[in-house]
Amino acid sequence: THTADLQGYIPNRDQMNAQELKDAYNHSFHAGKAIGKKVVYTDAGTILLGFMLEEMFQQSMIEILSERVLLPLGMNESTFLPKNLLNCVPTELHEQRGLIRGTTHDPKAFVLREHAGNAGLFSNVYDLTKFVRMYLNRGSYHNHQFLKKETIDLLLVNQVPAADKPRSLGWDFKYDVATQRPLLFHTGYTGTFLLIDVQKQSAFIFLSNRVHPEDHRNTYIEERDQLLATYLKEKSSVSDEMTSF
């Protein structure tokens, strides 16, 4: 929910190897006084969660996600460490790394590689459609129950009522224009997002790139929000037309 108020700083982060960075995360962060009261987006929580899962399953994050999510869903084109870089579109022309293609843009995930719980997934619209359908089917896909129905219901409830804005578990919220019921929403740093409306059985998968060839963050965010507002407005209008007699 990004309300742990994680406090910490890792100097020379990008110069460390994977084990050094993992040790630094495990010993450099602690919860602050505003825990549960303020939403501050940080990927430190998902990185630490990844380390916890590795301890529980005694596998790397890539192995955990591949065996329990990607392969059972049939997301055969999705991976964290692509072997054929030409299958991946360029991400950014970076000052230090040159043209980033087929390796994660995120500097922490770039160092952590198979141990990263915060970033680095390469996918396409066909595979992401399978992932989204699992959510729309309340956790089920092709007779395999990935998430309990109760878990999907739980995701649609504000998990931090004492905080300054609502959040779900791992997801942000957007809201239906007419009813103000919550929709699951998540963005990726490079310009992607997912918007899932479980009740209306619809979703918006947006695959774009805001950092290549140039990064115009503010312009992108403004235009993205306009696109979302238009989509939600038109979606609500279509729904009203379909339900009116």
Model-derived features: positions:
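Short intrinsically disordered coil segments
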Residues: 186-189, 222-223
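Short, surface-exposed loop or secondary-structure junction motifs
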Residues: 1-184
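Short, gly/Ser/Thr-rich active-site loops of penicillin-recognizing serine hydrolases
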Residues: 137, 141, 151, 156-159, ...
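Short Gly/Pro-enriched loop/turn and capping motifs at secondary-structure junctions
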Residues: 176-178, 190-192, 210-212
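Short, surface-exposed beta-strand/loop micro-motifs that present aromatic residues
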Residues: 183, 190-203
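Active-site-proximal beta-strand/loop segments in catalytic clefts of secreted hydrolases
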Residues: 1, 187-188, 207-209
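Short, well-ordered beta-strand elements
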Residues: 201-210, 214
